[in-house]
Amino acid sequence: NKEEKYRELLPQLHALVSTETDLIANLANVAAALKQTFGFFWVGFYLVKEDELVLGPFQGPIACTRIRFGRGVCGTAWKEARTLIVPDVEQFPGHIACSSDSKSEIVVPILQQGEVVGVLDIDSNELDSFDTIDARYLEEICTYIG
């Protein structure tokens, strides 16, 4: 059960990141934990640098390194400062295809003092892989980082 996996993972991640002050180390461990627990196709972070998102720690195939504000799923989640669940990436206007194997996606903004400082991006190689359960728990995980 997906929700049980999240419930087990959350306290572990909270303990892990609350004792480490280095952002990159925390992002790397969160990406690894999510990939290991759920077997997602791609899990990673993009960090805001001026008018672009720049690739941070990730688990999975080689990824796009820069995404402009408002472009694709990640750039749109940044612009709108909200979680986006995309059941079929082919149907998302302006989707940036880093990998043709990516079929569905969820992007969760990381906020500091109300400003988006990065996003958590998770891709699945199956359609319709993400729902409000994922959104709720991934948003909580992102509060540990922000």
Question: What do the predicted segments below correspond to?
Answer:
Residues 42, 107, 119:
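Short hydrophobic/aromatic beta-strand element in the GNAT-like acyltransferase core
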